[in-house]
Amino acid sequence: MRRLVVAAAAAALVLTGCSAKDVISAPSGSNVDVAAPDMVAMKAKSDVEACPKPQTDDGGLPSQTLPCLGGGRKVDLSRLKGPLVINLFQGECAPCKKEMPALEAFYQKYGDRVPVLGIDTIDTIPGVALRQAIQRGVTFPMVADPGGDLQGGPLSVSAVPTTYLLTADGRVERLKRGGMESLTEVKERVEAELGVAL
């Protein structure tokens, strides 16, 4: 069943403009190394922050542990606390690359109140995702879900990029399917879901 869900997600991603090589074309997620030595070295030379430590016992996300992109501590999503912006992306997805500076600008300005977490999803070439993020100045932490293990849950995607908001009370709300153009757009969407001004 999981293979069908992942296959359906892959097909949907292709239909939204990502090429087949952006999606699943190789081994299952369990066989993809998201902390290969070249990725670890690339991350060490960058300003990408370490993956977050556990913050709570049950923050509202499913109990799913994902590896840190480029090496570092694994992240149990259920131990993360909202509010938190969660962006699902792929390295060779043009709208994902275009959106990264807006998310980074939001993280720099409001990350102390509403952090950002990137998830490289359904992507068997995570080194490309890490390199593209670093080239665009991303510093927020990123994890990887190369096999699409999140599909079927609250962080499912039918297209990338897709951005969600985990609220302080544990709700998961979709901010947008597709790329956000600016810091202002990210801020306004977060404020609308939280019901507060940042």
Regions found by a protein language model. Give the residues of each.
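N-terminal targeting signals for export/organelle localization
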Residues: 1-67, 198
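Active-site-proximal beta-strand/loop segments in catalytic clefts of secreted hydrolases
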Residues: 88-90, 119-122, 145-146, 176-178
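Sec/Tat-exported extracytoplasmic proteins
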Residues: 92, 107-111, 190, 194-197
